[in-house]
Each structure stands twice: as C-alpha cells, then as structure tokens.
Amino acid sequence: MKESPVDIQHIDFYFDPMCPWAYQTSLWIREVRRLNDLEISWKFFSLEEINLVDGKKHPWERDLSYGWTPMRIGAWLRRSSMSMCDDWYGAIGRALHVDGRRPYERDVAIELLGQIHAPPTAWDDALADPTTHDEVRADHDRAVGQYAGFGVPILVFPSNRAMFGPVVVPAPMGDEALKLWELAKAYNSFPGLFEIKTPKTGHDRDYIAAAFTPYLVARQWKSVQNSTP
C-alpha cells in the first residue's frame, strides 16, 4: 500500500557525525521539523564499520573512534531524552563541519556537552558503559540488515521504506526546505523508484570541496567509500 505524501509525521534519521553530507541533510530536516512539526528519531550508522579495511579493528574494539565514540555519547544521552541526542548531534556536527574542530577529542567533547547542558560526567559515564557500544551497533546493524544501508544520510519513513539522501549542499531553508520535503515524500510514495541522481561535474566537485573546507581541514582520517549497490 502506497503511503500518502501528505501524512508523514515521523521519520527515523540515520547519521554518522563524520559525514558532511549527513550534517547538511540534518540541517534541512530540522528546518522541516521547525516548519512542519515533524518528529525525528535519531539513529546511528557507522561509516568506519561499513567501510572497514581488512586487517583493521572494528570501531568498538578501539579506544577511540572518530565517529563511533561521539555516537556512544549520543546513545547514552538518548536513553534519557531524544532531544538531548538531537542537541548533541547538532553541537558536534557544527563543531566539525562549520568550525573545523574535532568533537571526538575529550576536551572538545566536554565543552560541547556543557553547551547543551548535558550531565558533566556524560563523556566518562558513556565510555565506561560497554552497552553504549551495543546500542550504536544495534542501530547500525538494523540499517544494514533491514534497510540495506551503505552510507548516510538514511531516512526511514513510517511505511518502513528507507531512502538514502537527499544529498544536498547547502541545506535548503524556509520554503525551499518544504519543497524538498514534498519531493522526498513523493519519492517515498513510489515503491518501484530506487534512484534519482545528478552526475557531479568538475565545477560541482570544486563547489562541494569549498563548502566542506572546515571538515576537510579538521578530519584526521582517510575517506574510504566502497561501491554502492
């Protein structure tokens, strides 16, 4: 049964804080929420795990992982409040993708936790609790196993159909945000529609690189992207 494009009031949003594309999409979906009373459930997806290189440790086997560690903090915060997880993703996303900072570093993370009025022990408590690994891994495994996820952002609609994207920069605001939301809902209403994609020209790639400069300066990892299905 097709879902009406007009009656979507809740989505699951899968993200990895490392991903600049997911951050832009999160800004857009927050704007949709502001204008449309949309409810967002934040879920975790690990680019470090999905793109794991043979011979490397899984992110849950490392003392610190660039995306996994902040998501463990998010999982701990989400237990008490989805809005606190929301604020955490907003803070760490802004730090990395706008300010060019490294929110996976303890001092930066503790500063950001203070900004969102999280418990002062959140970093230490979350990382001392091995079940935060389990929660991040459960979200990731669900995205891969149930929705064939290969990257982020992923939107999951009430119909339980997943969509990769929209991949957009900059995040549209105001009426433009609502126009894109209508497109996303319409896309979801066609069960046989699997992909719409704009090829990136050299000019497009230069534009994207300029938009992502803070992230490119701050990151300490090499991007790895496996082929998509």
What is each stretch, according to the model?
Residues 23-112, 183-191, 195-199, 204-207:
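Structural alpha/beta surface segment adjacent to cysteine/selenocysteine redox centers
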Residues 18, 81, 129-132:
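Short beta->alpha junction loops/turns
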Residues 4-29:
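Local sequence-structure signature of Cys/Sec-based thiol-disulfide redox active-site neighborhoods
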Residues 1-7, 224-229:
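Short, low-complexity, intrinsically disordered N-terminal peptides in bacterial proteins
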Residues 14-15, 61, 99, 224:
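A structural signal for the main folded, soluble domain(s) of proteins
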Residues 28-32, 106-229:
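C-terminal cap of thioredoxin/glutaredoxin-like
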